[in-house]
C-alpha cells in the first residue's frame, strides 16, 4: 500500500497517544455516519470523511489491538433508526476500500495477483462501473417476489423500508425471466436524477419548506419516509450491482451476474465495462470522469471488482471490506467566485458554523451560492491541529475564493486568491456570543494539541434553542434517562409546541397539553399533504383515539418512573462535552448525589489553574509531569540556597538544557521566562480542582468541561430546575461477591445475540472491567465470528477464550 500522510503521521504516536487518537477519530466517524445514514444531513465532505477513515486505519495497522474496539472500527455505517423495524442482513452489507490515485489502482491489481499467486501470463479481469452517490438498498426476493427491502444501516442490521421500495418504479415487485433462484438478495443504490432533484426542490420551495442540499440527501430522505405515499410522490430510481444471500449459485462471473439482473427486469448501469489491466481500468475511470457532468445523476467515483467469482471467494475479506473490490474516488471539482458575506449557524452540538454566501457559480454542473467554511480556525487559516493551513491565509468578506465540490456533496471554500483581495478587506471577527441564545461562545483548549480548538461553541447548552431538540433527544435516550416512548418525533413535537424547552419541562407535562400538541401536529401534517396533493391520513376512529390516550398516559407514567435515577445516568443525560458514560460512572463513584458534586465543582472552580500555569503546561518538552515536579517545592533546594536567585530563576535552573531552550524560545528572554514561571507558581490549581483533575478516570479535560458547563448560569439554573423534579441515587456499588468482580474481559468479533454496548454494560454490572486489547492481565476473551488478532493474543498469553453462547451461559449462572 502506498505511504499516505495518515500513515506517516501515525509513525510518531506512542501507544497511549494512538489509543486516544483512535478514540477521537472513532467518535468523529460515528457522528459522521449517524448524520449521513440516519439524518441524511452530512457535515463532512467525502474527502474529509475519507481522511478520518484513512488515519483510523493507519493507526490500526500499526496498533492491531485497537482494531474492532469501536463502532467506527468494526462497522461500515450507522445504527439503524428506531423509526423503522429492523432487518438483520443474512450477508453483511460491507463498504469498500478507497483509491485516490492511479498508483493505488496499480497496487490493488498487483495485490490481487499476489494473493491469487498468478503468474504474469495468467489473466485476471475486473469490472469497472460508476459509483452511484445514493442510498444503499438490499432487496430480498423469494420465488421471484419482493418480500423485504432494507437499508444498509450499520452493515449488519438495516431498516425495513419494503413498503416504500415497492413505490419505486425501477424496483420490480416480481422478477421476470427464467432460472431465478428461490432466494435472491439484490444489492443496489437508490438515487435521484438531477432533473428530478430540481423538480423536488422547486416543489419544496413553493410549499415554503426547506430545500434538500443535494440529490443523495433527497433520495435518502424520500426512501426513509414513514408514509409510503410521500416516497411514491418522488421519482426515485435504482441501479442493481451486487447480491447478498442466494439459495443457489446462478453464474460464475460478476459481469454475468449483471446480465442476469438485466434479464430479470432489474436496472443495471450501462457504463459498466470489463477491463483486463490496471491501464484499462484507469482509462475507463478517465472516460467516466469526462462524462460525469452529462450523466444526469451524481457519481463520486468508479468501482472495480474482480470478475471471476471463484477468485472473489478465494480473496475473501479484510476487516470491513472485500479484498476483491476497490472504489476509485474522483478528485474535487473547483471554481472561482466572490465571497459576499459570512453567516453564522449554530449546530446541534453548539458549534458556531460559518457559511459562505457566494456570488453564484457553477461547480461540476451545479450552481453553488453557499459553501461551508467549517469553523473559526479554518476562516483564520488555522487547522484542527493548531497548525497553519493555506500557508496561514485567512478568508475575508470580499475575497475572491476557490470553491470546491468534493464527492458531489457539500461545497466548501478551499482557498483565497490574495492577488484579488480588496484593499478595504478586514479580517472576519467571529461573534463571542451565540446568535441563537446570547450565551458566551468560546474556543476550548484542545486536549490533544494543547492549542485552542478550531471550533467556537455556544455555552448555552440546555437553554440554547439551536441545540435544544438534540440535547433533549440525548436526555431521553437509552443510556440517559431512558424514557420509554419518548422517541425523536415526540421530542420534536413537544419542542415545537413550546411545551418542553429544557429537561425539567418534561416532568411538568400534563395530559391535556400533551394531547393537544400531538393532535395539532397531526392536523398540520394533514393540511400539508392536502396542499401537496397527497392523500391525507384518515381521521382517527374512536378506537384509535382511545389507543392514543393510552399511549399518552404511558408516556406520563414513564416520566413518573424516572423521578429517581442513578447519578451516573443523570450526568450522562445532561450531554456535557467530554462526560461520556465512563466519566459519568467515575464521578458517580466519588459523590453520593448531584448536590454534593455541584458543591465540589463550585470549590474546584475557585481553585482552577491560571493562564500562565496552563501556558507553561503546553510548551514542548515540558508537559504536566515535568511541570508538577518543577513546582513540588518553591523553597530553595540544596545548592540553590547559597545563590541570590529569584524564584523564577531558581525554577528555570531546575529544567534540563532542552527544557530551558524550549522555555526561552517561547518567552523570548530569561527575564520574561522567570517572570512567567513566578506567575505560574502563584497560579497552581488547588486541592479542590485536583480532586477531579488528578483522578485518572476523570482528568483535567473533563474537569474543565464540567466547570465550564456549570459556570454558565443558564446551565446551572436548568440543572437545579431538573433537581426540583427528580432525585439522584448513588451508583450501585460493585461488590466483591459479583460474578466477575475484578476480572478483565475482552470482546472480539461480531456478537450476534447482543450489541457490543449491551455486552459491555452487562460485564461491568457484574463487576468486570472491559478492555479493548488482550494482555497477560486479561481473564477472559469472548469471541464471535470474525475475531482476528485478539484470538492470537489470547493464545499467546494463555487467556481463556469462550464463544458468545458460552458467555450467555455464564451470565445465566451469575
Curated annotation (Swiss-Prot):
Residues 735-814 form the BRCT domain. Its EC number is 6.5.1.2. Transmembrane segments: none annotated. Zn(2+) binds at residues 434, 437, 458, 464. NAD(+) binds at residues 46-50, 95-96, 129, 152, 189, 305, 329. Residues 527-549 are annotated as: Disordered. GO terms for cellular component: cytosol. It is an enzyme of class 6 (ligase). InterPro entries: BRCT_dom, BRCT_dom_sf, DisA/LigA_HHH, DNA_ligase, DNA_ligase_AS, DNA_ligase_CS, DNAligase_adenylation, DNAligase_N. The active site is at residue 131. CDD domains: BRCT_DNA_ligase_like, LIGANc. GO terms for molecular function: DNA ligase (NAD+) activity; metal ion binding. It catalyses: NAD(+) + (deoxyribonucleotide)n-3'-hydroxyl + 5'-phospho-(deoxyribonucleotide)m = (deoxyribonucleotide)n+m + AMP + beta-nicotinamide D-nucleotide. Signal peptide: none annotated. Pfam families: BRCT, DNA_ligase_aden, DNA_ligase_OB, DNA_ligase_ZBD, HHH_2. Belongs to the NAD-dependent DNA ligase family. LigA subfamily. DNA ligase that catalyzes the formation of phosphodiester linkages between 5'-phosphoryl and 3'-hydroxyl groups in double-stranded DNA using NAD as a coenzyme and as the energy source for the reaction. It is essential for DNA replication and repair of damaged DNA. PANTHER family: CHROMOSOME TRANSMISSION FIDELITY FACTOR 18, DNA LIGASE. This is DNA ligase. It comes from Methylorubrum populi (strain ATCC BAA-705 / NCIMB 13946 / BJ001) (Methylobacterium populi). The gene is ligA.
Amino acid at each position: 500500500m502506498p505511504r499516505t500522510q495518515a500513515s506517516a503521521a501515525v509513525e510518531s504516536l506512542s501507544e497511549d497517544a494512538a489509543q486516544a487518537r483512535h478514540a477521537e477519530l472513532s467518535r468523529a466517524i460515528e457522528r459522521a455516519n449517524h448524520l449521513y445514514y440516519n439524518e441524511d444531513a452530512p457535515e463532512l465532505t467525502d474527502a474529509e470523511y475519507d481522511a478520518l477513515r484513512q488515519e483510523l486505519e493507519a493507526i490500526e495497522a500499526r496498533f492491531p489491538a485497537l482494531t474492532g474496539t469501536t463502532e467506527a472500527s468494526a462497522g461500515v455505517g450507522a445504527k439503524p433508526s428506531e423509526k423503522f423495524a429492523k432487518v438483520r442482513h443474512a450477508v453483511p452489507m460491507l463498504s469498500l476500500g478507497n483509491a485516490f490515485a492511479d498508483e493505488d489502482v496499480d497496487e490493488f491489481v498487483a495485490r490481487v495477483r499476489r494473493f491469487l499467486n498468478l503468474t504474469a501470463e495468467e489473466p485476471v479481469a475486473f469490472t469497472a462501473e460508476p459509483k452511484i452517490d445514493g442510498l444503499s438498498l438490499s432487496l430480498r426476493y423469494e420465488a421471484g417476489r419482493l418480500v423485504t427491502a432494507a437499508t444498509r444501516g450499520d452493515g449488519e442490521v438495516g431498516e425495513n423500508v419494503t413498503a416504500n421500495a415497492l413505490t419505486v418504479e425501477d424496483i420490480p415487485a416480481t422478477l421476470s425471466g427464467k432460472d431465478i433462484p428461490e432466494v435472491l438478495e439484490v444489492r443496489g443504490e437508490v438515487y435521484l436524477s438531477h432533473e428530478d432533484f430540481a423538480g423536488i426542490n422547486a416543489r419544496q420551495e413553493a410549499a415554503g419548506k426547506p430545500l434538500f442540499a443535494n440529490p443523495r440527501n433527497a433520495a435518502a430522505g424520500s426512501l426513509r419516509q414513514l408514509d409510503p405515499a410521500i416516497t411514491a410522490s418522488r421519482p426515485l430510481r435504482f441501479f442493481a450491482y451486487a447480491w447478498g444471500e442466494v439459495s443457489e449459485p446462478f453464474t460464475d462471473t460478476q459481469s454475468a451476474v449483471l446480465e442476469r439482473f438485466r434479464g430479470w427486469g432489474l436496472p443495471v448501469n450501462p457504463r459498466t465495462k470489463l477491463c483486463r489491466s490496471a491501464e484499462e481500468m484507469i482509462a475507463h475511470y478517465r472516460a467516466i470522469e469526462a462524462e460525469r457532468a452529462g450523466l444526469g445523476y451524481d457519481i463520486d467515483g468508479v468501482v472495480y471488482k474482480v470478475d471471476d467469482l471463484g477468485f472473489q471467494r478465494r480473496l475473501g475479506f479484510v476487516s470491513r471490506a472485500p479484498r476483491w473490490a476497490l472504489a476509485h474516488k474522483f478528485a474535487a471539482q473547483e471554481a472561482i467566485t466572490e465571497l459576499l458575506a459570512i453567516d453564522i449557524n449554530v449546530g446541534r452540538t453548539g458549534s458556531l458554523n460559518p457559511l459562505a454566501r457566494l456570488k453564484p457559480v457553477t461547480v461540476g454542473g451545479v450552481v453553488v451560492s453557499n459553501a461551508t467554511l467549517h469553523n473559526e480556525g479554518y476562516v483564520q487559516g488555522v487547522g484542527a491541529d493548531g497548525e497553519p493551513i493555506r500557508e496561514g491565509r485567512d478568508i475575508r468578506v470580499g475575497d475572491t475564493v476557490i470553491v470546491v465540490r468534493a464527492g458531489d456533496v457539500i461545497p466548501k471554500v478551499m482557498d483565497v486568491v490574495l492577488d484579488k483581495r480588496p484593499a478595504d478587506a478586514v479580517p472576519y471577527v467571529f461573534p463571542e456570543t451565540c446568535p441563537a441564545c446570547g450565551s458566551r461562545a468560546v474556543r476550548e483548549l484542545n486536549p490533544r494539541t494543547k492549542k485552542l480548538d478550531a471550533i467556537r461553541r455556544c455555552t448555552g447548552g440546555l437553554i440554547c434553542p439551536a441545540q435544544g431538540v438534540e440535547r433533549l433527544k440525548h436526555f431521553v435516550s437509552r443510556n440517559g434517562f431512558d424514557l420509554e416512548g419518548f422517541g425523536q418525533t415526540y421530542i420534536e413535537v413537544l419542542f415545537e409546541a413550546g411545551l418542553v424547552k429544557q429537561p425539567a419541562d418534561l416532568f411538568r407535562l400534563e395530559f391535556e397539553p400533551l394531547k393537544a400538541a400531538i393532535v395539532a401536529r397531526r392536523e398540520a401534517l394533514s393540511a400539508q399533504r392536502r396542499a401537496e396533493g397527497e392523500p391525507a391520513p384518515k381521521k382517527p376512529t374512536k378506537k384509535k383515539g382511545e389507543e392514543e390516550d393510552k399511549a399518552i398516559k404511558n408516556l406520563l407514567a414513564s416520566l413518573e418512573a424516572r423521578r429517581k435515577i442513578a447519578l451516573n445516568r443523570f450526568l450522562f443525560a445532561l450531554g456535557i462535552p467530554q462526560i461520556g458514560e465512563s466519566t459519568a460512572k467515575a464521578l458517580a463513584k466519588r459523590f453520593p448525589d448531584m448536590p454534593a458534586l455541584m458543591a465540589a465543582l463550585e470549590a474546584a472552580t475557585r481553585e482552577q489553574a491560571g493562564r500562565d500555569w496552563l501556558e507553561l503546561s503546553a510548551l514542548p518538552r515540558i508537559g504536566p509531569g515535568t511541570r508538577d515536579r518543577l513546582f513540588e517545592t518553591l523553597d530553595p533546594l540544596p545548592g540553590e540556597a547559597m545563590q541570590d536567585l529569584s524564584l523564577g530563576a531558581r525554577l528555570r535552573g531546575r529544567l534540563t538544557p532542552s527544557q530551558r531552550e524550549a522555555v526561552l524560545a517561547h518567552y523570548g528572554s530569561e527575564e520574561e521566562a522567570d517572570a512567567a514561571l513566578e506567575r505560574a507558581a502563584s497560579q497552581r490549581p488547588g486541592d479542590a480542582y485536583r480532586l477531579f483533575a488528578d483522578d485518572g478516570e476523570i482528568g483535567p479535560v473533563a474537569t474543565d468541561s464540567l466547570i465550564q458547563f456549570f459556570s454558565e448560569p443558564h446551565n446551572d439554573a436548568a440543572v437545579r430546575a431538573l433537581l426540583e423534579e427528580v432525585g439522584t441515587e448513588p451508583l450501585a456499588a460493585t461488590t466483591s461477591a459479583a460474578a466477575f468482580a475484578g476480572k478483565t474481559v475482552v470482546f472480539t468479533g461480531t456478537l450476534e445475540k447482543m450489541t457490543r454496548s449491551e455486552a459491555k454494560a452487562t460485564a461491568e454490572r457484574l463487576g468486570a472491567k472491559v478492555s479493548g486489547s488482550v494482555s497477560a492481565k486479561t481473564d477472559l476473551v469472548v469471541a464471535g465470528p470474525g475475531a482476528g488478532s485478539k484470538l492470537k493474543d489470547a493464545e499467546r498469553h494463555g487467556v481463556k477464550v469462550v464463544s458468545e453462547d458460552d458467555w450467555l451461559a455464564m451470565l445465566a449462572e451469575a
